[in-house]
Amino acid sequence: MWRIKIKAMKNHDIHHGGYPKESPTGCISKPKPIIICGDLNVAASEIDLKNPKSNRGNAGFSDEERAKFQELLEAGFTDAFRHLYPDREGAYTWWSYRFNARKNNAGWRIDYFITTDDIKDKIKDVIFHSDVFGSDHCPIEMDIDL
């Protein structure tokens, strides 16, 4: 069983001062590894969505959102998928229900496994199950050797 200690923070701390720097994970005490998984609603870079030019500035691909995501990584976290596949294109986890987006693979990668840097080398694979339907997102899976 893992126990996570989270430091109480005021809302403005993140908005004005970035992520706390007193530990590699910001507000979570060492030395326990951390894995964050879920829909973060941000495409981190142009490679993470089909149409970056027409979506620049839109929710999920604004400069501010992308900068905050980058701050998270700089605070001691790793994007597990990009760690293994830095140049892979067309790998998406969300598609609009409109315009046959999923059929045409016109999607966004907005679902993530984020790990603390200390366990990034234990990540074996990250898989997107784009063939599983039932949502506008697909299930994602990470194989990690802890």
Labelled PLM ranges:
Residues 1-146:
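Active-site regions of metal-assisted phosphoester/phosphodiester hydrolases
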